[in-house]
Amino acid sequence: MLRNSIAPSRGLGSLARQRLTTSGRNLITKRSYVKGKSAAWPPGRSIASVLPARKTSCATFTTSATRGNEQNIRSPPSPSSASAISPEGISKPASSSPAGQTSPGSSVNSPEPPKAQTSAPPPPPPPPPPAPKAKGRFGRSLLYLVLTAGVAYAGGVWFSLRSDNFHDFFTEYVPYGEEAVLYFEELDFRRRFPNATRHINTRPAAPRDEGEKVTIPSKSGVSWKVAENEGTSDVTHKGRHMSAVDAEVPRTGGDAKSAPNKPTTEDKKDSEKTGSKKDESKERVPVTDTKKSTVSLDEPRKPAVATVASIEPLASLQDDPIIQELTKIVNGLIAVINADESASKLAAPIAKAKDDFLKLGEQISSIKKEAHAAAQEEIKNAHKEFERSATELVRRIDEVRSEEAAEYREEFETEREKLANSYQEKIKTEVERANAVAEQRLRNELVEQAIELNRKFLSDVDTLVEKERQGRFSKLSELSAQVAELEKLTAGWNEVIGANLTTQQLQVAVDAVHSALESESMPRPFINELLAVKSLAGQDPIVNAAISSINPTAYQRGIPSTAQIIDRFRRVANEVRKASLLPEDAGVASHATSYLMSKVMFKKEASSSGDDVESILTRTEKLLEQGNLDDAAREMNALRGWSKLLSKDWLADVRRVLEVRQALEVCFLSLLPTLSLLIYYNEC
């Protein structure tokens, strides 16, 4: 009987758990696109896991028909309840000793090394370990058998609480199986419904009339079928199953006016909500007697059986077919209980179960709303995250574009420098070729001139020879002298031609150095030009000494032009004016005072007698404008203190320029003897 009362609770729990799991899966499916980022509903977790355990008594009592309908479906007692048997209750088999070890281990100390200069005898060897006691195989096998049987028996009891088919097999064929299963079911029932047994024990037993015989027809009672129509039964339709009062019971007084099968107000409301469908199936109603009995009006009327109204469909879950099906099943149970004579005993538990069922529906509705709100919130968060990611992506794209633009700009500058260098090399090559062509042309002209002179000489010789012949070899000595003179003249002309070529080449090299110094806007090295001058000068000591006197920094880094020197002097002059009033041991206050006083000082005109800083700067600027760098450097060298310290770099640059110019002038002056010789020979 206790098992029959627990079975419907398992059926209701199975349907409720199936409904909650389906709702949880639907919600998880709707939010699958934020599955990786959302931690609110992780995969594999259903809404049933967050529902609190509820103590319900709506499924405590049922009939054998409901159990027969769900004989192949057995579920845990409730969605939140665990197994009645804890894993700690199962004993573990004792661990056996290793098979390879037949004796207990013994510890033997390692022998110590022999000590020097000792005559003590070695210690005696340790005694052998005692032989192990033989263990009985029979006792071990019996222990394993007992443990295995206990584990199998406990597992059978646990699985019987989960499966109906195994429950029937276990209780029928295993000794004491039914008592063990009923014991654990009763424990589980008392744990879930602690007040149920107390109410049953305290309720007074109804007097039973066992004197009369009650005959039950063959087709009376509750059938396992809820409805015999094509579809499922709907408890919201009007019919005989909506009333537990027999239609054949006579009424007296005011109760006789109303028909026994007239639907109640709740039935009318239910029928208005679900529509006016006609019930095409015939419900089997329990009948205690097929014949109508006549009752006199003087007989006292039996008290009316208190019935429980059916559950109205939940308005918030009308679109959920599983909840509606569960409502129909519960209403069917209520109708069956109302049709029983002992319905008054079950009215309070059924009413409480009805209230719990309605609360469960409201809780499911609230959980669905919360899940929907959480899903909407996660969708908004996902949109915000997407917008943030898009903004970050745009920012990264802009950064990449700016980096690429910088790289392209750098490549452009590099290519431009390469093109400029290549054009400079081309120009240099063209100049060298033009110089080579000019030199070759000059050489050709000199050769032609020499040939012409030789031709003229030969013609003169022929003429003289003819005259001599005509004069019968007169003046032969004079002719020989003239020939010797002509030979000397020819040799001199050859020397003049070689010197002329060397002089021209050296002059071109010196001019190239001058052009390299004056044509560039920025100082550049002129090592190649100096090497050309030195190679053309050969062993000339004057040119070699002049080139050696040049500072290597000058031809390695280049020297500034006159315009650059003047421009830099103006900047240096401003700084010198600011520090003109400073003594040699000036501090921070002196520097600040000198800086302020330099703002109000007037620029003086050039004075030949002034020794102050402003006069020196003015004279130096005038000399620089006239191109006299030597005197300008002498004037700036006359400064003292901070002024001279500030102009130190400028003086160094001017000295390098003067050294280079002086060396070039020396190289040019070395060409003067050759030029004078050329002029002399030309005059001759």
From Swiss-Prot:
Topological region Mitochondrial matrix: 12-140
Subcellular location: Mitochondrion inner membrane
Residues that span the membrane, as ranges: 141-161
Positions with biased composition (Basic and acidic residues): 264-301
Region spans: Disordered: 61-135, 200-301
Topology in the lipid bilayer: Single-pass membrane protein
Biased composition range(s): Pro residues: 120-132
Topology Mitochondrial intermembrane: residue spans: 162-684
Coiled-coil regions listed: 367-445
Listed GO CC annotations: MICOS complex
Positions with biased composition (Polar residues): 61-74, 93-110
A GO biological process held by the record: cristae formation
Keyword Phosphoprotein: no
Organelle targeting peptide span: 1-11
Superkingdom in the source lineage: Eukaryota
UniProt entry keywords in alphabetical sequence: Coiled coil, Membrane, Mitochondrion, Mitochondrion inner membrane, Transit peptide, Transmembrane, Transmembrane helix
Family recorded in the similarity comment: Belongs to the MICOS complex subunit Mic60 family.
Entry function: Component of the MICOS complex, a large protein complex of the mitochondrial inner membrane that plays crucial roles in the maintenance of crista junctions, inner membrane architecture, and formation of contact sites to the outer membrane. Plays a role in keeping cristae membranes connected to the inner boundary membrane. Also promotes protein import via the mitochondrial intermembrane space assembly (MIA) pathway.
Subunit structure: Component of the mitochondrial contact site and cristae organizing system (MICOS) complex.
Protein name in UniProt: MICOS complex subunit MIC60
